[in-house]
Swiss-Prot record:
It comes from Solanum lycopersicum. NCBIfam families: crypto_DASH (TIGR02765). InterPro entries: Cry_DASH, Crypto/Photolyase_FAD-like_sf, Crypto/Photolyase_N_sf, Cryptochr/Photolyase_FAD-bd, Cryptochrome/DNA_photolyase_1, DNA_photolyase_N, Rossmann-like_a/b/a_fold. Expressed in the endosperm and embryo 96 hours after seed imbibition. In the embryo, detected in the root meristem, the root cap, the shoot apical meristem and the epidermis of cotyledons. In adult plants, detcted in roots, the whole leaf lamina, the stem and in glandular trichomes. This is Cryptochrome DASH, chloroplastic/mitochondrial. May have a photoreceptor function and might bind ss- and ds-DNA in a sequence non-specific manner. Lacks photolyase activity. Has a potential role in detecting the dawn and dusk transitions and, consequently, in circadian input pathways. Binds 1 FAD per subunit.
Length: 577
């Protein structure tokens, strides 16, 4: 593999050639944002809204809460490698803990894989735009700092993991490489190549025996599960028998499964082995991407310290968890929803930690529908990850899991108008401009622009999914492609009509036109009632809407999720919560 949180696309791994013109997408990371109620142009809003000193303090206090002297004396021998991928955190990192238990020295490594910065499978868009690249860079810098504080460091190597990891295992005579298991084909293929190349090596056993070619001991890759709230081994069914309907999955795991505790932290993970050159975290320009400044929108700060800071800020400092269910459908501002998804996608934030913080909040403050709803969203995230195992590459094919035969258009001019926010529909255009400028879009916005692309424009849903892959900070393949298959009507859901009426969505979720006026300044001077229907004051609509209003918005099943009604009535995944 967002991965709520990152990742690669699926299909023929790494060798695909673009069938369409390569998109030139120059992202940037200065993501700024408006306040919920501001009627004039707001200033930049950082997420989390804490100073660097506050984030560091919250991070250290959280780590201290999870430190345990009860882990016992370290008895392992030799060197173990921790191969970081989409698990860029110290807290609740089972791969890191297992390496500590089994060794006397840990070598943490991150591989800057050039394939992550290649092009998507079908339409040749950048796999990773500059915004997400910058976010990952910040995550790596923060991970390196936190590891150093705990007696380690982070080795940064540029190249393919299947070459780098076995080479390091041989050089440091490592007995085991620990990593978190991924679920989608490109990442799984890399895991298999790493395993195959490790098997060609002969290394010492964990008992510290020398590197004797006759000993027959090979370095092994040990994959652990740590990307979901519910552990895969605790599901009441195997993934091949996963229910096709989310509600059945949710009810089953809530009734029959327990969420495991976060792993404890030793006081120190050190020492590392002797390393001559730890390398450096790259700059965006070193990845062949261009960084540009923007002056509006949310500025997400990458890294575990920022992630823990956001949880603290949203739950405890601002006390917003208690109203989450009422505000989560907002579109403008940093605090209408948790905004945890970018850190979940990068693995900078553990879903089990969020679970434990929700339970602590319920114990110390209050328990209501809002506190439950955050967990409800995390179960959606779990569901799509487990579903990706069951569906494999069907998740990424035009017909989707249902193998539906639809004659999609791939009109490049029409698609470009959509991705650039030039459709003539202010609500669509404002959302697309926010995405390009910030790497983020509200859950409500994602539903609306998906419905418009596939229902009103008739464009191939995979073009939209790949553009989201380029742009989103919280991209992960399971959630992204799972949501798009549902929105396109080719997913596992038995209901097919997920049309979103733009006039109705505008009326319900941006009645004053503040969101569209913020992202489309040319509409700001118009009366509020005219901002969504500006007529000659705005671009001509690129297509006519198939429906003006529809009964299938609100509490019905829609593109990414409609967030009304009881949990039983919701069938869509939430992304960007």
């Amino acid at each position: 593999m967002i991965k709520q949180p990152f990742l690669l696309t699926k299909f023929t791994p790494f060798s695909s050639k673009s069938k369409h013109t390569l998109f030139t997408f120059h992202c940037n990371f200065s993501i700024k944002m408006a306040s919920l109620t501001a009627r004039t142009t707001p200033t930049v809003q950082n997420v989390p809204g804490l100073t660097p000193e506050e984030m560091e303090r919250v991070c250290e206090q959280t780590f201290q809460r999870y430190e345990s002297g009860g882990l016992g004396k370290r008895k392992g021998k030799g060197v173990a490698i921790v191969w970081f991928r989409n698990d860029l955190r110290v807290l609740d990192n089972e791969a890191l803990l297992r390496a500590w238990v089994s060794s006397e020295a840990i070598l943490p490594v991150y591989c800057v894989d050039p394939r992550l910065f290649g092009t998507t499978h079908y339409f040749g868009m950048p796999k990773t735009g500059a915004l997400r690249a910058q976010f990952i860079i910040e995550c790596l810098n923060d991970l390196k700092r936190n590891l150093v504080k705990r007696g380690l460091d982070l080795l940064i190597q540029h190249g393919k993991p299947e070459d780098i990891v076995p080479s390091l295992a041989k050089a440091y005579k490592a007995h085991t490489v620990y990593a978190h298991k991924e679920t989608c084909s490109e990442e799984v293929k890399v895991e298999k190549m790493v395993t195959r190349n490790l098997q060609k090596l002969v290394s010492p056993s964990s008992g510290g025996i020398g590197n004797d070619p006759g000993s027959g001991n090979t370095t092994k890759l040990e994959l652990v599960w740590g990307s979901t709230m519910y552990h895969i081994d605790d599901l009441p069914f195997d993934c091949e028998s996963l229910p096709d309907v989310y509600t059945q999955f949710r009810k089953s795991v809530e009734y029959k499964s327990k969420v495991r505790n976060c792993t404890k932290l030793p006081t120190s993970f050190g020492p590392p082995p002797e390393v001559g050159d730890w390398g450096h975290v790259p700059q965006v320009s070193e990845l062949g991407l261009q960084q540009e400044k923007v002056s509006k929108g949310m500025n997400f700060v990458g890294g575990e310290s920022a992630a823990l800071g956001r949880v603290h800020d949203y739950f405890w400092k601002k006390d917003l968890l208690k109203v989450y269910k009422e505000t989560r459908n907002g579109m403008l501002g940093a605090d209408y929803s948790t905004k945890f998804s970018p850190w979940l996608a990068s693995g900078s934030l553990s879903p089990r930690f969020i679970y434990e913080e929700v339970k602590r909040y319920e114990k110390e403050r209050l328990s209501n529908d809002s506190t439950y709803w955050v967990l409800f969203e995390l179960i959606w995230r779990d569901y799509f990850r487990f579903l990706s195992i069951k569906l494999a590459n069907l998740l990424f094919q035009a017909g989707g899991p249902q193998k539906v035969n639809i004659n999609w258009s791939q009109d490049q001019t029409m698609f470009d108008a959509w991705r650039r926010g030039q459709t003539g529909y202010p609500l669509i255009d404002a959302n697309m401009k926010e995405l390009a400028a910030t790497g983020y879009m509200s859950n409500r916005g994602r539903q609306i622009v998906c419905s418009f692309l596939v229902r009103d424009m008739g464009i191939d849903w995979r073009m939209g999914a790949e553009w989201f892959e380029t742009c989103l900070l919280d991209y992960d393949p399971c959630s992204n492609y799972g949501n798009w298959t549902y929105g396109a009507g080719v997913g596992n859901d038995p209901r097919e009509d997920r049309y979103f009426s733009i006039p109705k969505q505008a009326q319900n979720y941006d009645p004053e036109g503040e969101f569209v006026a913020y992202w489309l300044p040319e509409l700001r001077a118009l009366p509020r009632e005219k901002r969504h229907s500006p007529g000659m004051m705005y671009l001509n609509p690129i297509v006519a809407l198939k429906h003006g209003y529809t009964k299938k918005t609100g509490d019905s099943k829609t593109a990414f999720s409609s967030r009304r009604g009881r949990p039983e009535d919701n069938r869509r995944k939430r992304h960007g919560y």
